[in-house]
Amino acid sequence: ISILAALFDEVVEVLLIDEPEVSLHPQLQSYLLREMKSAAKRYNKTIIISTHSAEMIELNSASELCNFVFFRKDSLPKQISPDTPELNSVKLKEFLLRMSLIYSEGFFAKKVMLIEGSSDMILCRYLCNRLNLKLDVAGSQIIPVEGKGQFPVITKLFRLIGKEVCVLTDLDGFTDDNNIKFIINNNTVIIINPITIKIEY
């Protein structure tokens, strides 16, 4: 209530809010985010929030990526310049309009593994449990994409915001879509075939 009161107080010009999502369920977090955006526009307020909630990530355009500042313990804060050429990518703009919550969770990770779908997620969960790998504690996020054709644009997005990207794909990902091949240059690509698991760097 105190946050909402400050949002609509015309005397308050600048708000610094630490973790506004505390004690709020996801639906109320979404509501609060909408109210913050509305108040910022209506009353010309400057609102800065610190958050660990994926519900607080909402992008309607590529230029809104410039409003985010990403912090890591071992590096300088990362913020995208409005002049960044990648922001003009049509595919990136289209993806951001339909970006779901699972991708937003990757904004808080140090490393992101992109996988093709549910079968790969089952494999990853099995290996993590079998090998006792605590990827979440290590700051890693596994994200299933909507088909291998989405790998390039999603990789581009996470590179822009300073994330390390790893891709898990079948061999047909390279024979069916040549656009995927560019990922190899700067990322780890894990290729799965029916016989072995091969890791290429």
Region spans (language model):
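Non-catalytic alpha-helical coupling and interface elements of nucleotide-dependent molecular machines
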Residues: 41, 73, 129-133, 188
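Activity-critical C-terminal alpha-helical subdomain
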Residues: 174-201
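Short, low-complexity, polar/charged sequence segments that are solvent-exposed and flexible
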Residues: 34-35, 67-69, 88-89, 133-134, ...
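Noncatalytic linker/hinge segments flanking ATPase motor cores
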Residues: 13-15, 45, 55-62, 88-94, ...
